[in-house]
Design a protein with these regions (language model features):
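Hydrophobic core segments of alpha-helical transmembrane domains in multi-pass membrane transport
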Residues: 1-2, 55-63, 90-101, 121-130, ...
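C-terminal ends of transmembrane helices
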Residues: 1-13, 63-78, 127-137
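Transmembrane alpha-helix boundary signature
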Residues: 2-11, 30-41, 106
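Cytoplasmic-side transmembrane-helix entry/capping segments in multi-pass membrane proteins
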Residues: 11-22, 78-88, 141-148
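Transmembrane helix-loop junctions at the membrane interface of multipass transporters and ion channels
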Residues: 33-41, 142, 150-169
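Alpha-helical transmembrane segments
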Residues: 45-57, 171-176
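Structural signature of hydrophobic alpha-helical transmembrane segments
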Residues: 49-57, 113-122
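Conserved small/polar residues in nucleotide/adenosyl-binding loops
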Residues: 182-190
Length: 190
């Protein structure tokens, strides 16, 4: 409340980006805490934990990049890397393989479950950066709306992890409002 009352209206998108990032990292940490807790071994909880970590990590690092571009800490120019689509696709496939390993614990990767979790966190953080960096500063409001939707989905998934109905509903509302805002922002683009 204090931060939002002290920030100028022209800096509100940066604040929203930070709030989205905090929501993403909070959801990610809930997922990690519940995964490390040995009593959370039900199949549904493992699916929710994996989804929470995946979306929470992407939201956190993507929101930090969006904040940096809007506040001009990072250049607002799009950062295009050579072979970016191949790198992003490969990272996404590897993240999904890690999610399946977390859920089913097949042992095919020859890694401990905790190692798989922390590798997944690293990949999701990298994905958030690589998905947000190629977008120019002028399109950041659209990205922030999408990340708002992601933070709501991560919060809702965290609600499933800890069996909290209020968090499930609140996250779903934030996710839905972010999705509506994203579609209306994207519709204004030529």
């Amino acid at each position: 409340v204090l931060a939002s009352s002290l920030v100028k209206m022209t800096s509100m998108p940066e604040l929203v980006a930070l709030f989205n990032g905090f929501g993403g990292i909070a959801s990610l940490l809930v997922g990690v805490a519940e995964y490390i807790n040995p009593s959370s071994s039900t199949f549904i909880q493992l699916i929710a934990i994996s989804f929470t970590v995946l979306i929470g990590g992407i939201t956190f690092s993507g929101s930090l990049i969006a904040f940096g571009k809007l506040s001009e800490i990072i250049s607002g120019k799009p950062l295009i890397l050579f072979g970016q689509k191949i790198v992003l696709s490969s990272l996404l496939v590897f993240a999904l393989i890690l999610v399946l390993e977390l859920i089913f614990s097949t042992g095919l990767l020859n890694l401990s479950n905790h190692s798989v979790l922390f590798i997944l966190i690293g990949i999701t953080l990298l994905l958030g950066v690589l998905l947000t960096a190629p977008i120019g500063g002028a399109d950041m409001p659209v990205v922030i709306a999408l990340l708002n939707s992601y933070s709501g989905l991560a919060a809702s998934s965290a609600g499933f992890v800890i069996n909290n109905n209020v968090l499930i509903v609140a996250g779903a509302l934030v996710g839905a409002s972010g999705c509506l805002l994203y579609t209306s922002d994207a519709a204004d683009e030529p």
